[in-house]
């Protein structure tokens, strides 16, 4: 025992009082003399310290632990020997042990899962340093509070060992009990070799205890626990805690952790952390506590919704009905709302085991929706067992809802609500398909859609608002549909019926400030979209959830009158109406003597008009071929009317299908559909002479493909094109603002070593605006490799940006390459 007020480690730390003791040593409250800061001082038992090789092993593990920097792992401040004692000095964590927190009973899943995820991430951090904890239990976890909420911390590495220790360092050889019997892995229980998956088993026992309030085995003696961990089947978690029975994915995850065979458990703490994050997102649509689903007003119950909260994948952060109407909440866990809140969980199994499903369309209570969970009638929510096989994707997420929907449903009859929703769906749902979007969930008035292309998402939103505008002109004001359309792009986990990830939180914040009739999107969408398709203007900013950072918002510019976006997406009508203003402009142009008179005399002859247009550079040569099926198909594709273009091509005669223009239109259509193998197959069928006249739309599409696919595949596809034309076109694209086609054009020119006509510093600086971390990393690395001091401002911008938030933590998006290059370039200039 150390006496109070004694000094250790050359007087750097003062002992204040004992805190406790264990099998490996005593722990004292101490003070760092130089700073007056509280610390925890762990002193190894003298008899252990005297064991051969223990002092060296202690130093080695302390050195490794000191390199672990993670908010869920207690920080090592110092270590060394003081007289006959080996001391480990750690930060002093104020809070409550998980053991004490669990004394009253199990922890609600909504509180438990974020803490467990933090612990899994901390465990991953120590595993990455080559350390196995070996003694995970509630007593070794502390819960502290901060301005950002609760933080779980891993403590006590007294019997941790290196993942690959030498034989002489094995703790088992010096007679120390390895771990706590209640939480031992089967490998530890039988004295077999352990690896990091042993900690995952112990983590499973801890999780079982947290969620159910009891252990998976009854014991009660240490030898009983050893035997049960080694060979007995654990009590199923849903039997230990029946209120968790609807959480199928979470149950599966916990029981996987308790597998005797380590190969059947999650294979890393990183995988476990991802599964817990997915479980939290999926489960947070439920109320915390005993897992009661959020209140679902039944048709005819008389309950009046008042909040209209749309929830995709997570629950509202507040159960109060005083929040803004029509908001989409994606973060936190919704407390049980009052009967008047109208918060409904759709597709969640009822307590009787039957699926609740979506409420009937006729119900006025369908305005509030919870997205991201499937019915438990046979299919698990996306958590635990299968979450780890869903790969992150960079997608554009769209959220739409009717402004004032909740108030409106409360004053309308069931029949009126049914008609309103039917009209809403008929107007908007076809547009999702036409723009290659995928409807993930539809709940009442709210749609959750994902697009692979930000441009397609923006164009779909514009088409929606135009179609709604036309509808609203034909009905009384009280019956108009005023819809908000919000878009954000980022890395998500997208399953057939849910979208999980930070972009869901961001789009919630966007929806809070968006206005009906607008298409509102974030800077991530604005940077990635094709800006030639639509003009946008800034419309304020939002604060990113959980961060003190501002995110700029944009909205598509509306027309001064008529349809907000010019009705360019109308599915009916022809291009004939567009011909009138073009001819009027032609009449106003002063033509050379004779030609003007000729045009006035023969203006109704399409071929001659087309000839005049070509001479004027007006870009309307298609007038001479307005009956050509291929030309009409291209016109529809350029207007974003993919389905109509496909219908026209399918209806073409056999003779028309052999037209070069229609064959090329088929290439462009396959690109628009995202069918890239079919696109390249159709391209390979084009004759050499057809490639001479290939439309820019096809070249643009191939450049876009080049922005996201392997270089060699597309290099072969483009090898047949006339090199001079391809190079000239792609040089123009490479000088544009960032888009996938800009990036693809730049990659192609570099690949074929034909980029000498491009300002590479400017082009790669543009690519730094990509929302894709991998593209920004490649661009930063290339800028660094150019060795041009002109690139310093762009690379300084990279280093000033926050790192991207990935599913496994922060991601380096070229920060290190840029910082190294800046240092090197500045040294050269000096």
From Swiss-Prot:
Domain of life: Bacteria
One GO CC term, this protein: plasma membrane
Region of interest called Disordered, as start-end residue ranges on this chain: 296-326
Matching InterPro entries: A/G_cyclase (IPR001054), Kinase-like_dom_sf (IPR011009), Nucleotide_cyclase (IPR029787), Prot_kinase_dom (IPR000719), Protein_kinase_ATP_BS (IPR017441), Ser/Thr_kinase_AS (IPR008271)
Cytoplasmic topological segments: 1-605
Family assignment from sequence similarity: Belongs to the protein kinase superfamily. Ser/Thr protein kinase family.
Name listed for the protein in its UniProt record: Serine/threonine-protein kinase pkn2
The species this protein was found in: Myxococcus xanthus
């Amino acid at each position: 025992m150390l006496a109070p007020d004694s000094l250790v480690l050359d007087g750097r730390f003062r002992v204040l009082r004992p805190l406790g003791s264990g099998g490996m040593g005593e722990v004292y409250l101490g003070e760092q003399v130089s700073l007056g800061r509280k610390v925890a001082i762990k002193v190894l038992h003298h008899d252990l310290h005297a064991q051969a090789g223990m002092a060296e092993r202690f130093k080695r593990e302390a050195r490794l632990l000191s390199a672990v920097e993670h908010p869920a792992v207690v920080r090592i401040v110092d270590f060394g020997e003081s007289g006959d004692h080996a001391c480990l000095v750690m930060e002093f964590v104020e809070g409550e042990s998980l053991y004490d927190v669990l004394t009253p009973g199990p922890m609600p899943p909504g509180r438990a899962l974020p803490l467990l995820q933090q612990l899994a991430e901390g465990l991953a951090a120590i595993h990455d340093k080559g350390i196995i904890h070996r003694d995970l239990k509630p007593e070794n976890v502390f819960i502290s509070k901060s301005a950002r909420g609760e933080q779980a911390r891993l403590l006590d590495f007294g019997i941790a060992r290196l993942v690959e220790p030498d034989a002489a360092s094995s703790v088992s050889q010096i007679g120390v009990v390895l771990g706590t019997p209640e939480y031992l892995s089967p490998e530890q229980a039988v004295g077999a070799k352990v690896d990091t998956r042993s900690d995952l088993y112990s983590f499973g026992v801890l999780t079982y205890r947290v969620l159910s309030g009891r252990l998976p085995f009854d014991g009660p003696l240490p030898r009983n626990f050893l035997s049960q961990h080694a060979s007995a089947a654990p009590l199923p978690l849903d039997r230990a805690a029946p209120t968790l029975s609807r959480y199928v994915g979470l149950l599966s995850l916990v029981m996987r952790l308790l597998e005797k065979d380590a190969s059947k458990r999650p294979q890393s703490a990183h995988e476990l952390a991802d599964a817990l994050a997915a479980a939290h997102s999926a489960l947070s649509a439920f109320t915390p506590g005993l897992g009661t689903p959020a209140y679902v007003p039944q048709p005819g119950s008389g309950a009046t919704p008042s909040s209209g909260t749309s929830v995709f994948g997570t629950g509202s952060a507040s159960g109060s009905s005083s929040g803004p109407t029509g908001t989409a909440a994606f973060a936190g866990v919704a407390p049980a709302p009052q009967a008047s809140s109208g918060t409904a969980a759709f597709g969640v199994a009822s307590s009787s085991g039957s699926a609740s499903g979506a409420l009937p369309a006729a119900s006025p209570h369908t305005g509030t929706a919870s997205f991201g969970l499937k019915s438990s009638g046979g299919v698990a929510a996306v958590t635990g067992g299968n979450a780890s096989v869903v790969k992150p994707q960079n997608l554009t997420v769209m959220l739409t809802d009717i402004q004032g929907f909740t108030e409106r449903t409360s004053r309308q009859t069931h029949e009126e609500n049914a008609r309103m929703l039917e009209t809403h769906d008929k107007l908007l749902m076809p547009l999702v398909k036409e723009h290659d979007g995928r409807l993930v969930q539809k709940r009442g008035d709210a749609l959750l859609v994902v697009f692979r292309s930000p441009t397609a998402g923006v164009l779909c939103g514009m088409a929606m608002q135009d179609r709604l505008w036309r509808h609203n002109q034909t009905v009384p004001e009280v019956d108009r549909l005023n819809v908000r359309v919000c878009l954000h792009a980022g890395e998500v986990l997208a399953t057939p019926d849910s979208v999980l990830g930070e972009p869901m939180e961001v789009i919630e914040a966007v929806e809070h400030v968006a206005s009906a009739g607008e298409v509102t999107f974030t800077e991530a969408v604005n940077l990635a979209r094709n800006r030639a398709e639509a003009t946008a203007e800034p419309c304020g900013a939002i604060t990113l959830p959980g961060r003190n950072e501002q995110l700029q918002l944009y909205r598509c510019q509306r027309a001064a009158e008529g349809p907000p976006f010019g009705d360019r997406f109308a599915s009916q009508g022809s291009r004939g109406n567009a011909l009138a203003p073009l001819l009027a402009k032609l009449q106003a142009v002063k033509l050379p003597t004779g030609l003007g008179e000729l045009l006035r005399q023969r203006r109704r002859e399409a071929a001659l008009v087309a000839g005049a247009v070509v001479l004027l550079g007006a870009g309307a040569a298609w007038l001479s071929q307005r009956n050509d099926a291929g030309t009409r198909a291209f016109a529809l594709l350029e207007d974003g009317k993919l389905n109509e273009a496909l219908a026209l091509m399918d209806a073409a005669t056999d003779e028309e299908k052999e037209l070069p223009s229609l064959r090329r239109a088929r290439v462009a259509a396959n690109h628009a559909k995202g069918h890239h193998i079919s696109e390249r197959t159709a391209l390979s069928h084009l004759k050499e002479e057809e490639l001479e006249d290939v439309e820019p739309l096809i070249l643009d599409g191939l450049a876009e493909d080049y922005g996201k696919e392997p270089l060699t595949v597309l290099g072969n596809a483009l090898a047949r094109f006339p090199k001079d034309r391809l190079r000239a076109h792609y040089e123009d694209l490479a000088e544009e603002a960032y888009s996938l086609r800009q990036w693809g054009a730049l990659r192609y020119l570099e690949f074929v070593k034909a980029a000498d006509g491009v300002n590479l510093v400017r082009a790669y600086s543009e690519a730094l605006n990509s929302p894709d971390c991998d593209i920004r990393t490649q661009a930063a690395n290339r800028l660094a490799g150019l060795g041009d001091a002109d690139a310093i401002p762009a690379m300084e911008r990279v280093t000033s940006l926050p790192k991207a938030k990935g599913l496994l933590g922060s991601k380096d998006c070229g920060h290190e390459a840029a910082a190294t290059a800046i240092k090197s370039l500045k040294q050269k200039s000096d």
